[in-house]
Amino acid sequence: MAVKIRLTRLGSKRNPFYRIVVADARSPRDGRIIEQLGTYNPAHVNAPEVKIDEELALKWLHDGAKPTDTVHNILSREGILKKFDEQKNAK
């Protein structure tokens, strides 16, 4: 089963709010998920607000889940991909 780390949309019209989730690549955007990793609020007052469970994200990355482009950018901004690369190269 191909697994992706991606965003599911919540919120109202013109006021998006996203959950960062792990889901089967074949399921629809807002369909069934495997696990929720965190939230992303791009409309926050000063800067986009990101809350993510770092340990869960690293676990899924080690298990082979592929992040989408947007989630890849979010994870790199939060420093999670750097930690993943360090752990991967340390082995």
Swiss-Prot record:
Annotated keywords: Ribonucleoprotein, Ribosomal protein
Similarity comment: family membership: Belongs to the bacterial ribosomal protein bS16 family.
InterPro entries linked to this entry: Ribosomal_bS16, Ribosomal_bS16_dom_sf
Pfam families: Ribosomal_S16
Any single GO BP term: translation
GO molecular function: structural constituent of ribosome
Cited NCBIfam families: S16
Organism: Staphylococcus epidermidis (strain ATCC 35984 / DSM 28319 / BCRC 17069 / CCUG 31568 / BM 3577 / RP62A)
Gene Ontology CC: cytoplasm; small ribosomal subunit
The protein's name in its UniProt record: Small ribosomal subunit protein bS16
